[in-house]
Amino acid sequence: MGYARKVGWVTAGLVIGAGACYCIYRLTRGRKQNKEKMAEGGSGDVDDAGDCSGARYNDWSDDDDDSNESKSIVWYPPWARIGTEAGTRARARARARATRARRAVQKRASPNSDDTVLSPQELQKVLCLVEMSEKPYILEAALIALGNNAAYAFNRDIIRDLGGLPIVAKILNTRDPIVKEKALIVLNNLSVNAENQRRLKVYMNQVCDDTITSRLNSSVQLAGLRLLTNMTVTNEYQHMLANSISDFFRLFSAGNEETKLQVLKLLLNLAENPAMTRELLRAQVPSSLGSLFNKKENKEVILKLLVIFENINDNFKWEENEPTQNQFGEGSLFFFLKEFQVCADKVLGIESHHDFLVKVKVGKFMAKLAEHMFPKSQE
């Protein structure tokens, strides 16, 4: 009797163990299938969109079939982060799958593909995701989709009419650098539109402050500089950056080559506007600015900087403004250009540059500066 009871207990234990193993198998299998579906652009069992109608991740399209409309949605699973900074968030246990998913996502997210163009209804759902979700990887995916669509002129008006500008601008308050960069890219694409620029001007001061205080040479800083450059293509909003010009010169001196070129594009927009000439001349410039004129510096950096100086020199009448020169402080760009001999020594230092265009630009700049600053001494 005791032996039969032992056999019964063993049998019961085996049955319970087998059942538990099966449950664990089904659970892990279900998770794996959900991940594979999301990697293929399908739907997962995630719900983070709040109460917004149609903003569920498995409800991008009104149809349940595999139509072209549903294929046009770009889905970025949590382990398929795009960009160099996103690698820190990749899941170690899914590294191989993440690589495959990332390639598939990047292919589908190509701006050259018509599959990424969303309808107004789909754009509304994406905006609803941006507004309601708090998860970084969901925000990043939605912002990438918006950025791709904002590259098309006809979508810029649609996104604005759907209330997308303040929704995306609100993301600028996030501390996540990846999400913040994607939001700046969306706003940059939208800012090509004149009406969008008029509405985005209220965020310029915030973008300017964030750009200056961001980590040097970071993706967020570069994205902010690109947006500010777009916003200053016309003269209408350039005055809003007047108090930050000194900071831009500081970024120019301290930044790497990519940052230097982006700052120069922004300063060139300002230098072409005669109304901004005094603000540029008032700006404090680092003492290291002159050291940029050397043969080792990038040719494009030298040429753009010389063009900026030429524009300022052309727009500012040195003789007419001589009585007001005391309004420029020591260390300003005005005194950098006023000290002709020092500036000449710096520029003459690259006259032996092997590039012919650099030599021509240097000669042109020196002649103009001498003519405008010392007209009487040349008579």
Swiss-Prot record:
<feature type="repeat" description="ARM 1">
    <location>
        <begin position="111"/>
        <end position="151"/>
    </location>
</feature>
<dbReference type="GO" id="GO:0007005">
    <property type="term" value="P:mitochondrion organization"/>
</dbReference>
<dbReference type="InterPro" id="IPR006911">
    <property type="entry name" value="ARM-rpt_dom"/>
</dbReference>
<feature type="modified residue" description="Phosphoserine">
    <location>
        <position position="110"/>
    </location>
</feature>
<dbReference type="GO" id="GO:0005739">
    <property type="term" value="C:mitochondrion"/>
</dbReference>
<keyword id="KW-0735">Signal-anchor</keyword>
<keyword id="KW-1133">Transmembrane helix</keyword>
<feature type="modified residue" description="Phosphoserine">
    <location>
        <position position="61"/>
    </location>
</feature>
<dbReference type="GO" id="GO:0045944">
    <property type="term" value="P:positive regulation of transcription by RNA polymerase II"/>
</dbReference>
<dbReference type="InterPro" id="IPR011989">
    <property type="entry name" value="ARM-like"/>
</dbReference>
<keyword id="KW-0472">Membrane</keyword>
<dbReference type="GO" id="GO:0008104">
    <property type="term" value="P:protein localization"/>
</dbReference>
<dbReference type="GO" id="GO:0019896">
    <property type="term" value="P:axonal transport of mitochondrion"/>
</dbReference>
<keyword id="KW-1000">Mitochondrion outer membrane</keyword>
<feature type="region of interest" description="Nuclear localization signal">
    <location>
        <begin position="89"/>
        <end position="98"/>
    </location>
</feature>
<keyword id="KW-0812">Transmembrane</keyword>
<dbReference type="GO" id="GO:0005634">
    <property type="term" value="C:nucleus"/>
</dbReference>
<feature type="repeat" description="ARM 2">
    <location>
        <begin position="153"/>
        <end position="192"/>
    </location>
</feature>
<dbReference type="Pfam" id="PF04826">
    <property type="entry name" value="Arm_2"/>
</dbReference>
<feature type="compositionally biased region" description="Basic residues">
    <location>
        <begin position="95"/>
        <end position="106"/>
    </location>
</feature>
<feature type="topological domain" description="Cytoplasmic">
    <location>
        <begin position="30"/>
        <end position="379"/>
    </location>
</feature>
<feature type="modified residue" description="Phosphoserine">
    <location>
        <position position="72"/>
    </location>
</feature>
<protein>
    <recommendedName>
        <fullName>Armadillo repeat-containing X-linked protein 3</fullName>
    </recommendedName>
</protein>
<comment type="similarity">
    <text>Belongs to the eutherian X-chromosome-specific Armcx family.</text>
</comment>
<keyword id="KW-0963">Cytoplasm</keyword>
<dbReference type="InterPro" id="IPR051303">
    <property type="entry name" value="Armcx_regulator"/>
</dbReference>
<feature type="region of interest" description="Disordered">
    <location>
        <begin position="95"/>
        <end position="116"/>
    </location>
</feature>
<comment type="subunit">
    <text>Interacts (via ARM domain) with MIRO1, MIRO2 and TRAK2. The interaction with Miro is calcium-dependent. Interacts with SOX10.</text>
</comment>
<feature type="region of interest" description="Mitochondrion outer membrane (MOM)-targeting sequence">
    <location>
        <begin position="26"/>
        <end position="37"/>
    </location>
</feature>
<keyword id="KW-0539">Nucleus</keyword>
<dbReference type="GO" id="GO:1904115">
    <property type="term" value="C:axon cytoplasm"/>
</dbReference>
<keyword id="KW-0496">Mitochondrion</keyword>
<comment type="function">
    <text>Regulates mitochondrial aggregation and transport in axons in living neurons. May link mitochondria to the TRAK2-kinesin motor complex via its interaction with Miro and TRAK2. Mitochondrial distribution and dynamics is regulated through ARMCX3 protein degradation, which is promoted by PCK and negatively regulated by WNT1. Enhances the SOX10-mediated transactivation of the neuronal acetylcholine receptor subunit alpha-3 and beta-4 subunit gene promoters.</text>
</comment>
<dbReference type="InterPro" id="IPR016024">
    <property type="entry name" value="ARM-type_fold"/>
</dbReference>
<keyword id="KW-0677">Repeat</keyword>
<feature type="modified residue" description="Phosphoserine">
    <location>
        <position position="67"/>
    </location>
</feature>
<feature type="region of interest" description="Mitochondrion outer membrane (MOM)-targeting sequence">
    <location>
        <begin position="1"/>
        <end position="6"/>
    </location>
</feature>
<dbReference type="GO" id="GO:0005741">
    <property type="term" value="C:mitochondrial outer membrane"/>
</dbReference>
<feature type="repeat" description="ARM 3">
    <location>
        <begin position="233"/>
        <end position="272"/>
    </location>
</feature>
<feature type="transmembrane region" description="Helical; Signal-anchor">
    <location>
        <begin position="7"/>
        <end position="29"/>
    </location>
</feature>
<dbReference type="InterPro" id="IPR000225">
    <property type="entry name" value="Armadillo"/>
</dbReference>
<feature type="topological domain" description="Mitochondrial intermembrane">
    <location>
        <begin position="1"/>
        <end position="6"/>
    </location>
</feature>
